[in-house]
Amino acid sequence: MSLVPATNYIYTPLNQLKGGTIVNVYGVVKFFKPPYLSKGTDYCSVVTIVDQTNVKLTCLLFSGNYEALPIIYKNGDIVRFHRLKIQVYKKETQGITSSGFASLTFEGTLGAPIIPRTSSKYFNFTTEDHKMVETLRVWASTHMSPSWTLLKLCDVQPMQYFDLTCQLLGKAEVDGASFLLKVWDGTRTPFPSWRVLIQDLVLEGDLSHIHRLQNLTIDILVYDNHVHVARSLKVGSFLRIYSLHTKLQSMNSENQTMLSLEFHLHGGTSYGRGIRVLPETNSDVDQLKKDLESANLTANHHSDVICQSEPDDSFPSSGSVSLYEVERCQQLSATILTDHQYLERTPLCAILKQKAPQQYRIRAKLRSYKPRRLFQSVKLHCPKCHLLQEVPREGDLDIILQDGATKTPDVKLQNTALYDSKIWTTKNQKGRKVAVHFVKNNGILPLSNECLLLIEGGTLSEICKLSNKFNSVIPVRSGHEDLELLDLSAPFLIQGTIHHYGCKQCSSLRSIQNLNSLVDKTSWIPSSVAEVLGIVPLQYVFVMTFTLDDGTGVLEAYLMDSDKFFQIPASEVLMDDDLQKSMDMIMDMFCPPGIKIDAYPWLECFIKSYNVTNGTDNQICYQIFDTTVAEDVI
């Protein structure tokens, strides 16, 4: 690494960020996920930073190169991001990587050397940058609490999540979904550490060294997506393991009960779970080396109990954990409950034997789902008659609008008290006439971002262009006495890329002039427009079938949801590539391709049973409700 000639960069405080801009920022790390492999070949890291304005910014950073992402070791580190793109998603400002994105990371400890961490060979770092890092260190020392999650083994307790700085002594592959790490930090756990049975495993490491340190080493099982990281680790390297989980297990041996402490790194990246290799120059590694050197290598070997005899409490010799040892090594649920937490869990085998209607809380894995092509899951639903219908395809919608364009606009219906009208004639289309009516607000034409257009004779392409420039567009045609809506096969309102449809069965269309009764003629709320026009609006919903398996039984549950389950609006997903990618990532995380179900995450769900009668046949069906994807699951 070397410095390049100084360039004057401008850094934007976090309280002054605006969507659609590309900025340079400094911040103190408040939360982060170590880089992990996302869908495809890119690595992803999630970093939340804060600065002196006390405004937080969450950044989603992607790169095909693991080392190109910020090299963050703990909360409190200071980062500098260049060319960070700012966007607004779900009303929250967030940062994402843009072309040329670059980062530097600094230790946040007061008095520590200011040494930039970066994989770049060349970077810019001036005296002003030096001052900025020092200023943020001072501010963070009085405004941010030290990380309480970073613990030594001597301080850990059962049922705890913590970060551990340690040295790797040995490793072994257990199966495709789990991996064993033997580590130490120079201190002893308050309870004897469990031991994974390794007689059938190939252990890499100095066995005699491990044996001499057996009272100071712990066995950690890592699962799922962390396995490929564990495989790549070198024995002797210094690690930081994030969100390590402890659990106390009792064991019966020779008429006495003893306790052992288990260590698990569960699958997924929730709560920042992951593994990072620390360089030997890291200040925490310096302290760790001192602890290891001073550790008493001749500690009393008889005070620890090696747990290898009881099959119920040690790792099976076959090297595989039963899929449904839920209480032992499950990861945190990839979904969360939004209500009814008082309900006890019910196994699927019991649910399948009970009559409907009932409500249940379950914990299961997603064995499969339909439809596999996720865009096919988006439907239109009438909340009144409960009719489900397909979302019209672009080609079908274009035909509907072209049919409406065959009628010439009636001159008598133009330029009324409600709207001003403009007519143009198309070229090379037999002189097709298109009428655009600009709806007025108290007799005055509003700005384009507040203006509603009524369009006669427009094609889908023309309407889409107008909907990008104006607040809203309603396709209409000339009636006998007034403008009227097209058949409800077409949208009754178009806003940007979102098409709002109405139910043909439940709607009773009223005159376009009823738009005059709307008090607010600037925001054009779809439900308000629908109400004055006599339309029962259809809702965009995701409709899917989940095959759930908890080891006691298999059950098919129906999901129908507009935006709560995926936290993605069904109305927007068809026109937004980023939302489609997010949904693909969620489903690939629920039901990962190419691996066994053992490695799938658990889903905590509420389901309700109900009876469906088809002729003389009665069937019990199940539907997921009051459940949502955990926000930090990806």
Curated annotation (Swiss-Prot):
Any one Gene Ontology MF annotation carried by this entry is: telomeric DNA binding
Pfam families from the xrefs?
POT1, POT1_C_insert, POT1PC
Gene3D superfamilies cross-referenced by the UniProt entry? Nucleic acid-binding proteins (2.40.50.140)
Report the main location listed first in the record. Answer: nucleus
Annotated compartments: Nucleus; Chromosome, Telomere
What are the annotated GO cellular component locations? chromosome, telomeric region; nuclear telomere cap complex
Return the InterPro entries for the record: NA-bd_OB-fold, POT1, POT1_C_insert, POT1PC, Telomer_end-bd_POT1/Cdc13
One Gene Ontology term from the biological process aspect of the record: regulation of telomere maintenance via telomerase
The source's superkingdom equals Eukaryota
- Alphabetically ordered keywords of this record: Chromosome, DNA-binding, Nucleus, Telomere
Q: What does this protein do?
A: Component of the telomerase ribonucleoprotein (RNP) complex that is essential for the replication of chromosome termini. Is a component of the double-stranded telomeric DNA-binding TRF1 complex which is involved in the regulation of telomere length by cis-inhibition of telomerase. Also acts as a single-stranded telomeric DNA-binding protein and thus may act as a downstream effector of the TRF1 complex and may transduce information about telomere maintenance and/or length to the telomere terminus.
Assembly mode: Homodimer or homooligomer. Component of the shelterin complex (telosome) composed of TERF1, TERF2, TINF2, TERF2IP, ACD and POT1. Binds single-stranded telomeric DNA as a monomer. Associated component of the telomerase holoenzyme complex. Found in a complex with TERF1, TINF2 and TNKS1. Interacts with TNKS1. Forms heterodimers with ACD. Identified in a complex with ACD and single-stranded telomeric DNA.
Describe the family membership recorded for this protein in Swiss-Prot or TrEMBL.
Belongs to the telombin family.
Recorded protein name is: Protection of telomeres protein 1
Q: List the source organism.
A: Macaca fascicularis
